[in-house]
């Protein structure tokens, strides 16, 4: 089931976010100080708990427990992460379908080198617009996808 995130989901959302970013972005950024030093579960969970308004655009996929989440901003997809233990089970697709059907989600930014994510979004009609910019504080580009 897909439902709005609550403060009770903060630690699970933080865990999924941090571990998925480590797995998928380490080979792109090559910065272990960030991946294993700066990116920590507890501070992110605490940030959600102390600032519950940060959960407002987050929807979780729950099947006994939270297995993934999508963070929406108007018609944009800000983040979508599925716990790596539950990848390839259709969870990400259900979250994208939910965003499209309920919020008319039609755009997002993704790391240019994140081919896996670009292919995934392509299956839902998202295509590269040709717009790109540097990701804040890095030397890596993000590209805009629209449907």
Question: Model regions: which residues?
Answer:
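Conserved acetyl-CoA-binding loop-helix of GNAT-fold acetyltransferases
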Residues: 82, 88-101, 119-123
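Conserved GNAT-fold acetyl-CoA-binding loop/helix
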Residues: 21-47
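Conserved beta-hairpin
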Residues: 55-68
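Conserved acetyl-CoA-binding loop of GNAT-fold acetyltransferases
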Residues: 122-131
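A short beta-loop-alpha structural element at the N-terminal edge
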Residues: 1-15, 25
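Conserved beta-strand-loop-alpha-helix junction that forms the acyl-donor binding cleft
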Residues: 108-119, 134-139
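A short, internal acetyl-CoA/4′-phosphopantetheine-binding micro-motif in the GNAT/acyltransferase core
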Residues: 77-87, 110-111
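Conserved GNAT acetyl-CoA-binding A-motif
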Residues: 96, 101-113
